[in-house]
């Protein structure tokens, strides 16, 4: 059972985040309503997620398939969309397709083909983003900026996939200036992708920015920011969702 103190903390945190989001948007002449707040709820319990769903959070993001399944089965998002934002193993695609409103982390032709087959079998259209490894880190998932274009072409040609945009996580060790430059590079990549005018795509989503850098992500064009600890507090990895 969550305490009143925990509930108040979450409400105050979300209000503070919303204020910062709006300020960053206005600095660059953007409408704050055009930027969505994704609560990254990895390791958070069903109870925590349900409690946060009444707050001005637009959607929820899951890194682990088991947590997406448990929370969607429990209706923890209370009617708000759930996105899959973590590395997706091909053997778990069937559990995610149709559950996640948007899979943000498609990063290979093999994974793309698995998503297409699962969506076809379920007779639905799955929306996706392509994840870019913008910092070229060997330890991270994501396609390189150079390899993006053939993957985009392939994604746009799939009958049961709708391509919506790009996602990225800059290197954690990057300085604020370096991080903002990575965000600017993502904005430019999305603009170039949109200029390809795919028929079966709407390149309007740029998912980037987390608890430590989301204002700069918004200044550089993010349409979704993914925020976890700044909403819920420090993660306890011993807890099971």
Which residues are covered by each model-predicted region?
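Gly/Pro- and small hydrophobic-enriched strand-loop and loop-to-helix capping segments
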Residues: 222-240
